[in-house]
């Protein structure tokens, strides 16, 4: 059953900056407070936290903000702050303002969208320093087919002196309950469109946004799919002829820590802060939505975006499952003298770092949320052994190292039921993974600059308070022989390849002269415009992959423009000698695939079956959704010497599936290795 606990713990308020480890942040916050405030310091709010419970509403007030929740639904119906009676969209129905939701289905059925409404309300804690309330919805067999078979406990917390509120939830599927899939769960906030029109996701991803009305017929024209709209007659004429698409604002988990909206009159910021990734799925580079036109801000805990069904949790055979999502923090700030939304953004980043450094929090009272004392840590040093790159061990500089549920090597990127804990190694390969929940894990890693995945060969059992030192561990990346040639950088992204400018009729001006130009709409159409008479040909030793290798192998339209046809790329290279003893090896690392099949042929385009085929792979949809990667795949192809010739050789790469413009492959890296032990040590 869901655990409810009322034990009072001493509260460490993240809004009180510790001088022990927050010195620089404290100084910067003081500077910003000259013109920007998070509601003022706690001394400006001498009253404690007050809870008021009525028949249909629950109100929590700490003198800085007032949070109103429907009862027993647990929907955020109002947030009063800085003289504004409600920051939520008052034009929306009350159950369409601030809510937890999910998309679920019975096996083989279509997804059902469910705004989670509680049926029972409980006070978990109530004193001057903290109020925590609970809204639960319990499942029983009479609800089969109508509600997702989960017990759900939604929590909301307001602390004294805190300019914001926290929310988290516990989902539980009891043993023997029905099978189901859950494609997505999140917290969504719909803000007032007459106030919040400036959105910020990163230092270089901020802009005035369209109004939701601009996406409707008469003001906007739908493009290739409903999410993408060309603004033909927007309310703000400066946005005319821009493309709006929520997927242009996706962020990788590792960078998805703070985003939100700014109101100009009065100057207020509403920010969604996620202090930890432990409850998200898919690892550090899984991409998710953030904020978009609405104005909407999201805290997404898991989704199938940029991955497909591989990241949809599927519960079968009556398995037991419980997971805590959050807490996440909704932070409010304001400016005394408004000059630039950048001030509120900078303050929000400071608060984000404070929340991150305060994790795990000590104030949530669910027994399912472990304190820092109940968690453990793992440390070690990761080294790389690649005799063809260096005779000595190589430090795993900036490696991604993480703990996830036990599984096969690389399984972490598809794991979607448990918790994951990730860190980056330093320049010498040293890593520490702190504040890990108790349980059994495998340790996984991957290293930018090297192909493949690492998995430590033993299960790691985390107990309360443990500190496990693994010492030196060694990753030997896939390697059979010396590198003859390579294309790209093995970093699980296609960002290093050629990304074209968009059609000038379909631009998002935020991404003009921006490092993320791959987020522009319609780049898949640019391939055929750049290669009108034939497909891409890459010549090793002459071509430059930053200019001559298109970032995605997409389809092209047929001559009569009524259908799509496959594309075949060529890699041309010379071999002075073909060694007959031993096989060559072609490594193809794929950064993303969408309903694709890669067929590989050597020096014979017409041979069937091909020398190698991946079969049908991928549902990432990264091409349509402006990603530069999806799920990582690595293929190691044995290349028989009889397939090669002395002199000119050609590898044909055919993406053979072609019913849509969005089918295709993004390559991460390609490498041809000579036979092991041969004299083929000269790079081409």
List PLM regions with ranges.
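Beta-strand-rich ligand-recognition modules
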Residues: 425-428, 564-581, 589-683
């Amino acid at each position: 059953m869901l655990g409810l606990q009322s034990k009072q713990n001493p509260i460490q308020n993240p809004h009180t900056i510790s001088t022990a480890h927050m010195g620089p942040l404290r100084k910067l916050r003081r500077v910003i407070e000259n013109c920007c405030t998070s509601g003022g310091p706690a001394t400006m709010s001498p009253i404690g936290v007050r809870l008021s419970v009525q028949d249909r509403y629950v109100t929590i007030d700490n003198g800085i903000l007032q949070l109103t929740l429907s009862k027993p639904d647990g929907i955020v119906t109002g947030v009063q702050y800085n003289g504004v009676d409600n920051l939520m969209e008052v034009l929306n129905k009350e159950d369409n303002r601030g809510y937890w939701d999910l998309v679920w289905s019975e096996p083989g059925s279509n997804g059902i969208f469910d705004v989670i409404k509680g049926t029972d309300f409980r006070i978990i804690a109530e004193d001057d320093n903290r109020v925590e309330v609970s809204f639960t919805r319990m499942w029983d067999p009479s609800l089969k087919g109508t509600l997702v078979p989960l017990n759900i406990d939604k929590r909301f917390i307001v602390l004294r002196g805190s300019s914001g509120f926290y929310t988290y939830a516990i989902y539980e599927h009891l043993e023997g309950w029905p099978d189901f899939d859950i494609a997505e769960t999140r917290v969504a906030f719909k803000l007032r469109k007459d106030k919040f029109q400036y959105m910020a996701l990163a230092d270089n991803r901020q802009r005035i946004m369209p109004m939701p009305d601009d996406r409707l017929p008469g003001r906007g024209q739908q493009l290739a799919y409903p999410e993408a709209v060309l603004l033909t007659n927007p309310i703000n004429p400066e946005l005319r002829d821009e493309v709006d698409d929520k997927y242009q604002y996706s962020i990788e988990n590792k960078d998805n820590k703070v985003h939100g909206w700014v109101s100009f009159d009065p100057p207020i910021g509403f920010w969604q802060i996620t202090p930890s990734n432990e409850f998200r799925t898919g690892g550090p580079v899984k991409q998710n939505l953030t904020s978009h036109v609405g104005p909407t801000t999201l805290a997404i805990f898991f989704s199938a975006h940029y991955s497909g069904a591989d990241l949809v949790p599927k519960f079968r055979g009556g398995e037991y499952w419980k997971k805590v999502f959050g807490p996440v923090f909704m932070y409010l700030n304001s400016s005394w003298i408004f000059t630039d939304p950048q001030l509120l953004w900078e303050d929000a980043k400071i608060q984000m770092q404070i929340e991150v450094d305060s994790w795990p929090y000590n104030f949530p009272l669910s027994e399912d949320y472990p304190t820092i004392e109940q968690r453990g840590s793992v440390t070690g040093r990761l080294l790389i052994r690649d005799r063809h790159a260096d005779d000595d061990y190589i430090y795993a500089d900036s490696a991604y190292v993480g703990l996830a549920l036990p599984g096969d090597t690389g399984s972490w990127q598809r794991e979607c039921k448990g918790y994951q804990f990730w860190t980056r190694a330093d320049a010498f390969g040293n890593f520490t993974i702190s504040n890990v929940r108790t349980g059994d894990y495998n340790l996984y890693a991957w290293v930018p600059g090297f192909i493949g995945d690492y998995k430590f060969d033993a299960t790691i059992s985390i107990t309360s308070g443990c500190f496990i030192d693994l010492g030196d561990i060694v990753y030997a990346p896939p390697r059979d022989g010396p590198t003859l040639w390579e294309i790209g950088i093995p970093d699980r992204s296609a960002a290093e390849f050629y990304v074209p400018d968009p059609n000038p009729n379909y631009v998002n001006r935020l991404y003009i002269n921006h490092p993320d130009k791959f987020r522009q709409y319609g780049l898949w159409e640019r391939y055929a415009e750049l290669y009108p008479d034939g497909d891409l040909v890459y010549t090793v030793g002459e071509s430059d992959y930053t200019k001559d290798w298109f970032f995605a192998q997409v389809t092209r339209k047929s001559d009569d423009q009524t259908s799509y046809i496959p594309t075949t790329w060529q890699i041309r290279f010379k071999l002075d000698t073909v060694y007959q003893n031993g096989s060559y090896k072609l490594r193809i690392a794929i950064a993303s695939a969408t309903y694709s099949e890669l067929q590989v042929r050597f020096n014979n385009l017409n041979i069937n079956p091909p020398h190698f085929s991946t079969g049908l792979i991928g549902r990432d949809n990264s091409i349509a959704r402006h990603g530069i990667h999806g799920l990582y795949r690595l293929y190691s192809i044995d290349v028989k010497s009889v397939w090669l010739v002395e002199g000119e050789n050609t590898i044909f790469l055919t993406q053979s599936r072609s019913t849509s413009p969005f089918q295709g492959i993004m390559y991460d890296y390609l490498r041809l290795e000579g036979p092991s032990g041969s004299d083929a040590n000269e790079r081409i």
